Amino acid sequence: MAELKNDRYLRALLKEPVDVTPVWMMRQAGRYLPEYKATRAQAGDFMSLCKNHELACEVTLQPLRRYDLDAAILFSDILTVPDAMGLGLYFEAGEGPRFERPTDTIDAIKKLSIPDPEDELGYVMKAVSTIRRELNGAVPLIGFSGSPWTLATYMVEGGSSKTFEKIKKMAYAEPMALHMLLDKLADSVILYLNAQVANGAQSLMIFDSWGGALSHSAYREFSLHYMQKIIDGLTRFADGRKVPVTLFTKGGGLWLEAMAETGCDALGLDWTVDIADARRRVGHKVALQGNMDPSMLYAPIPRIEEEVGHILAGYGEGTGHVFNLGHGIHQHVDPEHAGAFIKAVHAQSKQYHK
């Protein structure tokens, strides 16, 4: 593997000194870029794009050609794991992801098998190894998965949900069934993420997109417990250096202390959290990633630059901060505004790393 030329993202996650605050964007390979739209049209549909390792590599690299980003993230989807379990993933126009065979009974859960990442998910591993090779050491490659709870919400609901009625009914009326599902998913995610590391991922992120829908105690029981299990089972060293792990629960600002106890290296923050407060609470234990509101990228560029300065000042001096948005970039953002955001982070953060 080529030697890493820019490792400030990995260094910041491990709280080692950096020259400027590293920055990348969730969904940086996405629909706001005209070149992404062209490649997706070539693929035909979203899952065909994910399953073609050469095109997945191409869209992963596209934002790096435009912007001075400090990390690349595998182009894939969190629902690859339930898809590999045979649920029949498809995308409904305007509806988002759907499953032909929801996992909403204990019998359906018992029948689920744990997918082999090198077989049913081999297309993801091929994408990881291709991207790592094509990066040629420019920046680190982030691998990722959805959290067991978040994957389970889609599997039980049969797709996206605003109320989470079916999975919450299972959680409170049939908790043993849900725990069986979450346990299988945790085992699947451990294998999946470790295979990503074996194929070249240099950092890992667990996206708990819907953990914030849970009550205080239910979050610990149904989400955090299974993310803890995953962290305990992960490969933490590869290529002679640590593989940092970032946990991100959207709406998880209440639980930062509990999340920091898992042994992860960093916590992702959404835009509802004050980063200065987060650093006071858990900054002695973990690095922090975030956390500008993605909608701020619709603002005039001077306002974006002002907000970047506000967040950098909130975090303050020293390492341990990876700048990002508080969630994925919106599809209608002007690419020039994204570029101004990235430049502002690097330019304004130098003063905090003397």
UniProtKB/Swiss-Prot annotation:
Belongs to the uroporphyrinogen decarboxylase family. Homodimer. It is an enzyme of class 4 (lyase). Transmembrane segments: none annotated. It comes from Shewanella baltica (strain OS185). It comes from the Bacteria. Keywords: Cytoplasm, Decarboxylase, Lyase, Porphyrin biosynthesis. This is Uroporphyrinogen decarboxylase. One of its GO terms (molecular function) is uroporphyrinogen decarboxylase activity. Pathway: Porphyrin-containing compound metabolism; protoporphyrin-IX biosynthesis; coproporphyrinogen-III from 5-aminolevulinate: step 4/4. GO terms for biological process: protoporphyrinogen IX biosynthetic process from glutamate. PROSITE patterns: UROD_1, UROD_2. Substrate binds at residues 27-31, 77, 154, 209, 327. It is found in: Cytoplasm. The gene is hemE. The record marks 77 as: Transition state stabilizer. It catalyses: uroporphyrinogen III + 4 H(+) = coproporphyrinogen III + 4 CO2. PANTHER family: METHYLTETRAHYDROFOLATE:HOMOCYSTEINE METHYLTRANSFERASE RELATED, UROPORPHYRINOGEN DECARBOXYLASE. Its EC number is 4.1.1.37.
